[in-house]
Structure formats: C-alpha cells, structure tokens
UniProtKB/Swiss-Prot annotation:
InterPro entries, alphabetized: NCE101 (IPR024242)
A GO cellular component entry from the record: membrane
Transmembrane regions: 10-27
Domain of life assignment: Eukaryota
Name assigned to this protein: Non-classical export protein 1
Compartments it resides in: Membrane
Family statement: Belongs to the NCE101 family.
Keywords: Membrane, Protein transport, Transmembrane, Transmembrane helix, Transport
Pfam families hit by this protein: NCE101
GO biological process entries: exocytosis; protein secretion
Membrane topology summary: Single-pass membrane protein
C-alpha cells in the first residue's frame, strides 16, 4: 500500500521545510526578547571564543 501524501511525494518535504523555516522566523521575530535572538547569541559566543583564543596566544 502506498503512503498518502498531502501534496506530492516531492513537494511534501519542501512544504515541511518551508513551514518549519517560516515558523522559526516568526518565533525569532516576535517571541524572543531583545538581545536573545539566535544571531546575537551566536555573535556573543563567537566573540567570547575569539577573546579566549587571543588570551591563550599571549
């Protein structure tokens, strides 16, 4: 018995990726407090690692 698809065999995964990405975008834009977005958290982590690597070199 073949599996049922919402749209088609190839469009279902693309639709899932689109919905997930859009949901993530909305969460980042609306529900995260200022200063806590993924971009800001990643930059903070990156800067922290860069400082620790420079202190190890000196």
């Amino acid at each position: 018995m073949s599996q049922p698809y919402l749209i088609s065999k190839w469009m279902d995964p693309l639709f899932g990726i689109f919905v997930g990405t859009y949901g993530y975008y909305l969460y980042e834009k609306e529900h995260r407090p200022r200063g806590r977005s993924l971009r800001e958290l990643a930059l903070r982590k990156w800067n922290k690692q860069a400082v620790s690597q420079q202190s190890m070199k000196n």
